[in-house]
Amino acid sequence: RSIDVHAAGAVCWKVVDGEVRVLLVHRTQHKDVSLPKGKVDPGETLTETAQREILEETGLHIVLGVPLGKSDYRLPSGKSKRVHYWSAEVDPGEAERSSFEPNGEIAGLEWLNIKRAIKAVTYEHDGDILRTFETLFNNNRLNTFPVIVVRHGKALPTEKWDGPDWSRPLAHRGLVQAQDIAGGLAAFG
């Protein structure tokens, strides 16, 4: 089935006094409490969207961690929406430097322990993502680093290159491909 609206977000988290806390947003227009997320802009990857939306909604600069899955649901308009989520550990200094100010989209931010956060979110699908996060956290599965394997972009044809294959330069299309993927990879640090 096709998805009408694609979005991305993150479970932003930090440890305070030995207890994990996750960040929830109080959305003004929707009058709800949810995980920070937003719609994909044209030409943007899901990872770029997650990073941009967290910055816009919370003022936090984040690096994406472990993928937490996706939520599929229907909007009041009847359109289908899919939101992809990642974990994002927030450096304590970054949390203090956040430039967040209440605005027309987000009325406030709240750091809660997981149990309270699951009870506080308005939508069950946010609770599901938080439960996935909790399982991974409790099983020490969030302390990871990314290993991203990418095949090179389109290279010059072999018949147009005299040097060794490993030194064959990218064609124009390959350079465009490399530029297109850079932002999505940068979201992982």
Task: Place the predicted regions along the sequence by residue.
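Nudix hydrolase/Nudix homology domain
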Residues: 31-32, 95-157, 161
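Unchanged
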Residues: 40-126
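Residue-level signal for well-ordered alpha-helical scaffold segments within enzymatic catalytic domains
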Residues: 52, 88, 132, 180-184
